[in-house]
UniProtKB/Swiss-Prot annotation:
One of its GO terms (cellular component) is plasma membrane. The Ras-GEF domain and the N-terminal Ras-GEF domain form a Ras-binding site and mediate Ras activation. The modification Phosphoserine is found at S725, S726, S736, S745, S749, S801, S805, S925. GO terms for biological process: long-term synaptic potentiation; postsynaptic modulation of chemical synaptic transmission; Ras protein signal transduction; response to endoplasmic reticulum stress. Residues 243-429 form the DH domain. Residues 1052-1081 are annotated as: Responsible of the affinity for farnesylated versus geranylgeranylated Ras. Residues 155-193 form a coiled coil. The gene is Rasgrf2. It holds the Pfam family RasGEF. Widely expressed. Detected in brain, lung, spleen, pancreas, kidney, liver, heart, mammary gland and skeletal muscle. It is a peripheral membrane protein. This is Ras-specific guanine nucleotide-releasing factor 2. Residues 22-133, 470-588 form the PH domain.
């Protein structure tokens, strides 16, 4: 009997365990049984050259194993199938993959396997093929042969290298030997030549010839080198490098100044306030200090390092490498990002802290430090916001003068891209906080302080000089000439308009403001604006004729004092129209908020704040709009980015109209759209109000209680009925039908709770404080309130004036609420028509029979009247504030006239709407009779004198006045659209911005004239006297607030042709030199013209600022962030910042000087024959005082 083969079972089981865990290939296969042609599914695991199979994947002991050494594996076709069984099963079996493992000797039955997928079968076959140990031995032998071959090659190379080394050493030895031989031969030759050399040196002719040759060679070399140097100096590359170096030098100076500003911020405010917060009675908490000065100290340390690096680079001049410095700065930008995000909150915390008197007193003490130079804390907090845009402009200029192959170019471009990303965020934050900083700056200028400006919800609208007419003496003023010095001096007021208040101040000689003791702060909710005061106080002719129709009246009715009247006089009709538009819009916003809140909440379950919040389009970001956290004057989030369609939609949203949005839109719409598109949108709103208004806005406009739908359909309101004999202009009223007399009155429970809501129009002959009460119907019994109210409601009889609309008709709209409290809501502003529409639409249940015949809720009529209101309101602002648009675009003017004429043909037009339309038509059609604006060309034609004056015969006062007159004429002739788009920096600047270029040309011509007149004198004393006279002219210009003229003269005196005349300057008196230093400090460009800005802030118009200061600001904004985002949205935050700058420029443009023209003086100032060009001036200067020898 043959014995069975023994094997080590324990080791086999261990190998099976390893195969389960680390096998080369594992998985389920079907194995064909030997005894029957049946297939059994087993779990196989291949480990090295042994194949194990298990009953299942979790089986611990193998069912069998196969030794694969010497075997082969090949694919076999599927075996033939019988027809038994379902067809689907046969198809499945045919699709399976079959292969067979064949063993080396005959008589051994092959192992037949199959799997479900062809890919798995191929992987198993490949793994079995590679499992042969014999194949691995063959591969190892091949590798060993290659290794031995490589070792032999290496040894051969080593031997060759040693041989080469020996050859080199031998050659070195040979070279040394040859050198020594050459030296010996040279010494031998030298000993053999002494006689011949002596002979040559002794020949004088040869010696002279050699000297001449040497001189000529040197001269030719020097000439050629000089030519090379001159060519390079004049080459574009050298010019580019000079400009690049100058940019770097300017950057170092600006960085030094910025570090100094941060040093003042940290050491003058942050650290002292930290110490104050640790005192026994701290005026401020440590948390507030941290909130105000977040990261300020870290930013200072960062820029100190950056500044030191810049100075170290200058030590290596002319090689200036800056890219690595920006590489150091870029990773620290997250510090700036935190500062930027905290900026708005920082100013809000500061405004709240200023309400603490102890803190405010301490802060004024810190701001009084001479190092602050009169600047406020919020100014220092804003400096870091402008630094990143400054870096971007510097990088733009550096890249413009950096060749494309320069080693720094890529690094500088990368730094610029990163800084631009942060700059966009910074511009948004600066735009959002502009209003807070403006309010705090005005509050700091007022000596007595003004707590209402510490309310961060106040939005600054407008400022300017107006003349206050004493109302008690109006009968005596008929003989006073308009613009007389006595009236202007005594009655001139600096007025500031905010969304909730109107401030009237006087300015002291030091530039500080003082609020009027009576009527200095007017709450707009208590004011009624009358554009054309009544004529009852004058027996002969009205004040409109007396003051040229430049006066308007504000009737103030405080709840705890007697009513009083403020009469103000505007410098021009255009200024009056602009003031009236802004004041009326602010009053509309506040009045309609209060009115709407009372009416709406009384008659509907939907409150006004809920109506705004429920419209997600007003506060939630979308693909075509993005909002900021700051609220506008209507308590709706300001727009940060938006498409043109969304901006036009906001302009025509009938629920509210924010005055700050409207002003920004009208200032900057040319950047992202055209006047024709804006007018087309207004025309669509008027002609098709329902199709032009978003559906969601219509739904919220008519938001009512859930069960009031049937009342909305039939237009009946049982609880409300409105009545006024003459509706307020543009304040839409409702009637029973469009052709009936429009009489509405508020009755019922609303009438009982808030008092009678009377909408009356005071005629031109009525008293401004007269109140006309319309009889109200008795309220229903279940809502009646007894007439005998509690005694503490003493204010129920106080009459307030609600919405007033843009019209020149004086009128009063009054309403009352319990306790005499004035309805001053913080909700969004809507027109009066909107308020009544919603109130009427949201009426309660049950209608008395008397109301069935009078239709008081016609939705279409309300929408039409409100749309007409909005169109006329926008057009009034547009025409009154931006008349240049229509003067320069006749097609736009004709289209507006056609639209207004179409409005006049509307049979349903209310009388006041008709009058407002006629006023706009009149403003468009007639020339402004009080327009005293002259153009420079007109003055040149008027100065046709036979002989011009000379410099000696003209006084300093005459020169200063006429220079001021010319500068202001040139300055105010610049249309505001030229400030958009940086046209003055483009190649076609003379075509795009002709007036800005003309202003620049006039500045240069006046400066050239000053320098030429000084250089015309041959003797030193005459030149010194001329310098002293021009300095006196500059000082008079300063007194006249002509800072452009000051800079014209000081820049002429600082020209190299005049500044180098040391002998002349020694003859100039010390007082004149000190005065000139004072003038130069005032108009210095240091710190973004900080001294000039502070001076302009403390002076009343008229004034002529330096235009370059504003152009620099606009360039900062334009370079720092694009007009459109990558998604194509308008950057409205940038538009807001541009609008603020244009508003400040136009403030100085619109107030004219009352200086008489002197043709002889003007002809002298404009005579170009007296001007000497720059090169001739310098040559003349060298003749007068030649250069001293070195």
């Amino acid at each position: 009997m043959q014995k069975s083969v023994r094997y080590n079972e324990g080791h086999a089981l261990y190998l099976a365990f390893l195969a389960r865990k680390e096998g080369t290939k594992r998985g389920f296969l079907s194995k064909k049984a030997a005894e029957a042609s049946r297939w059994h599914e087993k779990w196989f695991a291949l480990y090295q050259n042994v194949l194990f199979y298990f009953e299942g994947e979790q089986s611990g002991r193998p069912a069998g194993m196969y030794l694969l050494e010497g075997c082969s594996c090949e694919r076999t076709p599927a075996p033939p199938r019988t027809n038994a069984g379902p067809a689907g099963a046969r198809d499945a079996l045919d699709k399976q993959y079959y292969f067979t493992v064949l063993f080396g000797h005959e008589g051994q039955k092959p192992l037949e396997l199959r799997c479900e997928e062809e890919q798995a079968g191929k992987e198993w076959m490949e793994a079995i093929h590679q499992a042969s140990y014999a194949d691995i031995l063959i591969e190892r032998e091949v590798l060993m042969q290659k290794y031995i071959h490589l070792v032999q090659i290496v040894e051969t190379e080593k031997i060759a290298a040693n041989q080469l080394r020996h050859q080199l050493e031998d050659q070195d030895t040979e070279i040394e030997r040859l050198k020594s031989e050459i030296v010996a031969l040279n010494k031998t030759k030298e000993r053999m030549r002494p006689y011949h050399t002596h002979q040559e040196e002794e020949d004088p002719d040869i010696k002279k010839i050699k000297k001449v040759q040497s001189f000529m060679r040197g001269w030719l070399c020097r000439r050629k080198w000089k030519t090379i140097v001159q060519d390079y100096i004049c080459s574009p590359h050298a010019e580019s490098m000079r400009k690049r170096n100058q940019i770097v030098f300017t950057m170092v100076e600006a960085e030094s100044e910025y570090v100094h500003q941060l040093y003042i911020l940290v050491n003058g405010f942050l650290r002292p306030l930290r110490m104050a917060a640790s005192s026994k009675k701290p005026p401020i908490s440590h948390d507030d200090v941290s909130s105000i000065f977040l990261n300020s100290e870290t930013i200072m340390f960062l820029h100190e390092i950056f500044h030191q690096g810049l100075k170290a680079r200058l030590a290596n001049w002319p090689t200036l490498v800056l890219a690595d410095l920006f590489d150091i700065l870029l990773p620290m930008l997250n510090i700036y990002q935190e500062f930027v995000r905290n900026h708005q909150y920082s100013l809000q915390v500061l405004a709240n802290c200023k309400q603490n008197r102890d803190f405010d007193k301490l802060l004024k003490q810190y701001e009084g430090n001479p190092a602050c130079e009169g600047r406020m804390l919020e100014t220092f907090l804003t400096y870091p916001m402008f630094q990143i845009p400054r870096y971007i402009i510097t990088l733009h200029e550096l890249l413009a003068h950096t060749p494309h192959e320069h080693v720094e170019r890529k690094s500088l471009e990368f730094a610029k891209s990163k800084l631009e990303e942060l700059s966009r965020v910074m511009h948004d934050e600066v735009s959002d906080t502009e209003n807070i900083r403006k309010n705090l700056a005005i509050e700091r200028m007022i000596v007595e302080g003004c707590d209402i400006l510490l309310d961060t919800s106040q939005t600054f609208i407008r400022q300017g000089s107006l003349i206050q007419v004493p109302s008690v003496e109006r009968g005596k003023l008929s003989k006073v000439r308009l613009g007389s010095l006595s009236l202007k001096k005594e009655g001139e007021r600096q007025c500031f308009l905010f969304t909730k208040h109107f401030l009237i101040c006087t300015r002291s000689s030091g530039g500080k403001l003082h609020l009027l003791k009576t009527g200095g702060v007017l709450s707009l909710i208590q004011c009624t604006l009358i554009e054309e005061p009544d004529t009852s106080d004058d027996d002969t002719k009205g004040p409109g004729h007396m003051f040229g129709h430049l006066d308007f009246k504000i009737v103030v009715e405080p709840p705890d004092a007697a009513p009083f009247t403020v009469v103000l006089l505007a410098p021009s009709r255009q200024e009056k129209a602009a003031w009236m538009s802004d004041i009326s819009q602010c009053v509309d916003n506040i009045r309609c908020n209060g009115l709407m809140t009372i009416v709406f909440e009384e008659n509907s379950k939907v409150t006004v704040p809920h109506m705004i919040k429920s419209d997600a389009r007003l506060h939630k970001d979308d693909t075509d709009i993005c909002f900021s956290k700051t609220l506008n004057s209507c308590k709706v989030p300001q727009i940060r980015y938006a498409s043109v369609e969304r901006l036009l939609e906001r302009l025509t949203d009938l629920r509210f109209l924010s005055i700050d949005f409207l002003n920004t839109f009208l200032h900057t719409y040319r950047i992202f759209t055209t006047a024709a598109v804006v007018l087309g949108k207004l025309s669509d709103i008027y002609k098709r109000p329902f199709t032009s208004i978003p559906v969601r806005s219509l739904e919220l406009f008519f938001a009512t209680s859930q069960n009031n739908r049937e009342h909305l359909v039939d237009g009946k309101s049982p609880r409300l009925c409105r009545k006024f004999s003459s509706p307020p202009p543009l304040a839409v009223s409702r009637t029973s039908s469009p052709v009936r007399a429009r009489k509405l009155s508020l009755t019922s429970s609303l009438n009982s709770r808030i008092g009678a809501l009377d909408l009356t129009t005071s005629s031109s002959s009525s008293s401004p404080t007269t109140t006309v009460h319309s009889p109200a119907a008795s309220p229903p019994p279940h809502t009646a309130v007894p007439e005998s109210a509690p005694a503490d409601r003493a204010g129920d009889s106080t009459d307030m004036s609600p919405c007033r609309s843009p019209s020149t008709t004086p009128r009063h709209l009054r309403y009352r609420q319990p306790g005499g409290q004035v309805a001053d809501s913080t909700h969004c502003a809507v027109s009066p028509a909107s308020a009544f529409a919603i109130a009427t639409a949201a009426a309660g249940h049950g209608s008395p029979p008397g109301f069935n015949n009078e239709r008081t809720c016609d939705k279409e009529f309300i929408i039409r009247r409100t749309a007409t209101n909005r169109v006329l309101n926008v057009l009034r602002h547009w025409v009154s504030k931006h008349s240049q648009d229509f003067e320069l675009n006749n097609e736009l003017k004709m289209n507006v006239l056609n639209l207004l004429e179409e409005v006049l043909r509307d049979p349903d037009l209310l009388p006041q709407e008709r009058k407002a339309t006629a006023n706009i038509l009149r403003a468009l059609s007639q020339d402004d009779q009080d327009d005293i604006h002259l153009k420079l060309e007109d003055i040149i034609q008027m100065t046709d004198c036979p002989k011009a004056e000379c410099f000696e015969t003209l006084s300093a006062m005459e020169l200063a006045e006429q220079i001021t007159l010319l500068d202001h004429i040139v300055f105010r002739s610049i249309p505001y659209e030229e400030f958009l788009g940086q046209g003055w920096m483009k190649l076609d600047k003379n075509e795009r911005t002709p007036y800005i270029m003309k202003t620049s040309q006039h500045f240069n011509e006046m400066s050239n004239l000053v320098a030429s007149q000084i250089m015309n004198y041959a003797d030193i004393s005459s030149r010194a006297n001329a310098i002293e006279k021009w300095v006196a002219v500059a000082d008079i210009c300063r007194c006249l607030h002509n800072y452009n003229g000051v800079l014209e003269i000081t820049s002429a005196l600082n020209r190299s042709a005049i500044y180098r005349l040391k002998k002349t300057w020694t003859k100039v008196s010390k007082q004149t030199k000190a005065l000139m230093d004072k003038l130069q400090k005032t108009v210095s460009s240091e710190g973004r013209f900080k001294n000039l800005r502070e001076t302009l802030k403390n002076c009343n118009p008229p004034a002529v600022p330096y235009l370059g200061m504003y152009l620099t600001d606009l360039a900062f904004i334009e370079e720092g962030t694009p007009n459109f985002t990558e998604e194509g949205l308008v950057n409205f935050s940038k538009m807001r910042m541009i609008s603020h700058i244009i508003r400040e420029i136009r403030q100085f443009q619109q107030t004219a000087y009352r200086i008489d023209q002197q043709p002889k003086v003007i002809q002298y100032l404009l005579d170009k024959a007296l001007v000497i060009d720059e090169d001739t001036l310098y040559e003349l200067s060298l003749k007068i005082e030649p250069r001293l020898p070195a």
